[in-house]
Amino acid sequence: GVIVRVLYDDVGCWNVKKKFFDEMKESGVEVYAFLKVVFPIFSSKVNYRNHRKIVVIDGKVGFVGGMNIADRYVKGLVWGNWRDLHFKITGKGAQGLQSSFLIDWYVVSKNLITSRDYYPITPAYGESCIQIATSGPVGQWRTLLQAAIFSIANAKNYIYIQTPYFLPTEG
């Protein structure tokens, strides 16, 4: 069988019925809420959310972007189709997504997954470079800002940066 692991944001799924996740678990899916919040008013974890939308298949193919797991992303809404960016990454980039997911998985499950099976040898593709950069509110380094500045400084002809949270500092 295929091992399926799902992380979901507890605050982002506040209105999703428990039955939805229970059915996944009953089907053999390993499911965890990311930093479950029982009493939001008294919790220091309420602002430490996980907005990552990552799918990784066998450590070789990854998908990342803005799409959630919901019917509206496939069927659209009454007022029209949902539009979002989600893209496919293969090779070493997919393994970067795998690492990001497995670190988050460890945070909530305490199950450290380091098997080489999750990081297969992948051939190099073309001359493109990809770096998966992650960040969160508890880190002291501004990882995404540093990655953007480094990428801009080292670009030869052009650069594409996509983020829903581009809030540059003043100055």
Give a label for each model feature.
Residues V2-G171:
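Charged, low-complexity intrinsically disordered terminal segments
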